[in-house]
Amino acid sequence: MAELFYDADADLSIIQGRKVAVIGYGSQGHAHALSLRDSGVDVRVGLHEGSKSKAKAEEQGLRVVTPSEAAAEADVIMILVPDPIQAQVYEESIKDNLKDGDALFFGHGLNIRFGFIKPPAGVDVCMVAPKGPGHLVRRQYEEGRGVPCIAAVEQDATGNGFALALSYAKGIGGTRAGVIKTTFTEETETDLFGEQAVLCGGTAALVKAGFETLTEAGYQPEIAYFECLHELKLIVDLMYEGGLEKMRWSISETAEWGDYVTGPRIITDATKAEMKKVLAEIQDGTFAQAWMDEYHGGLKKYNEYKTQDENHLLETTGKELRKLMSWVNDEEA
């Protein structure tokens, strides 16, 4: 069973006694920086010259400096820029500013797990990753609650890495809800697998295949959209609240029977075998290297896939249908 840690297990004074740099000010960056600041921590935000986020961070009362200045000032450096550019930011702005006893923090383990960033031996390498988007992390903190976090230590140069990670997690409200101890390897591999096989890749492919099956059989795209995409939220919300049990308790017996007898025909042993191949490609670094090559090679295939799906009948149908739904915010669609 997982080890869980709460407020009583974490000493906030540890992180309060350090100087923290949050590199990046996106979804997670703003939540970490503001919540740490409100927890009495000395925080600065590191942003590159010309960053659009600088004005927002300063308006919210944070001091903004360049990433290299932030790294030079701080002894705890949390890297929260996108995965593909973390290694570049590290090499250009952080590496030469690290001192023995410093701590390098991450919100996701990809660059450490696959060796794109190789910290020196004298620094702690830690992870604190809230299991929720930044806006939720910040809102829960302000309301006196928290979002569960996972925490890990890859390199414990000082012998105090996990205590520091717990203290950091407490500073953003994580220990109010609970912190699960993990490893960089476990977090990275399971996170990538979940995204690819279930949450994003698996779900998107399932929705598209179902929609195409109905429309190719002559059913109206609008009806197919409702049945294969729109109503997915209703089911996922029930699963989110109470697992498969609550979902099955809430649906009709007809739907539940269809779940039992048809689900295994869609997700077959062959599907699971392919999932195992996907996991193996994550574990051996094939996916990570391919993604880095794609990103730094100009994102040609990425943009082709993106454009192809943007023009899919599912998407064009959905954009029109969502105009009928006053409760749906489709401003960014």
UniProtKB/Swiss-Prot annotation:
Record's keyword annotation contains NADP? yes
User: Which EC number applies?
Assistant: 1.1.1.86
KARI N-terminal Rossmann domain mapped to chain residues: 2-182
Q: What positions does the entry give for Mg(2+) 1 binding?
A: 191, 195
Query: Which ranges carry the KARI C-terminal knotted domain?
Result: 183-328
Q: Where does NADP(+) bind?
A: 25-28, 51, 53, 83-86, 134
- Please name the GO terms of the biological process aspect recorded for this protein, alphabetically: isoleucine biosynthetic process; L-valine biosynthetic process
- Pathway field: Amino-acid biosynthesis; L-isoleucine biosynthesis; L-isoleucine from 2-oxobutanoate: step 2/4; Amino-acid biosynthesis; L-valine biosynthesis; L-valine from pyruvate: step 2/4
Q: Which InterPro entries match?
A: 6-PGluconate_DH-like_C_sf, KARI, KARI_C, KARI_N, KARI_prok, NAD(P)-bd_dom_sf
Magnesium as UniProt keyword = yes
Residues at which Mg(2+) 2 binds: 191, 227, 231
Q: Offer an example of a GO molecular function term for this protein.
A: magnesium ion binding
Keywords associated with the record:
Amino-acid biosynthesis, Branched-chain amino acid biosynthesis, Magnesium, Metal-binding, NADP, Oxidoreductase
Active site at 108
State the protein's purpose. Answer: Involved in the biosynthesis of branched-chain amino acids (BCAA). Catalyzes an alkyl-migration followed by a ketol-acid reduction of (S)-2-acetolactate (S2AL) to yield (R)-2,3-dihydroxy-isovalerate. In the isomerase reaction, S2AL is rearranged via a Mg-dependent methyl migration to produce 3-hydroxy-3-methyl-2-ketobutyrate (HMKB). In the reductase reaction, this 2-ketoacid undergoes a metal-dependent reduction by NADPH to yield (R)-2,3-dihydroxy-isovalerate.
What family does the entry list? Belongs to the ketol-acid reductoisomerase family.
HAMAP family in UniProt: IlvC (MF_00435)
The protein here is known as Ketol-acid reductoisomerase (NADP(+))
* Source organism of this protein record: Streptomyces avermitilis (strain ATCC 31267 / DSM 46492 / JCM 5070 / NBRC 14893 / NCIMB 12804 / NRRL 8165 / MA-4680)
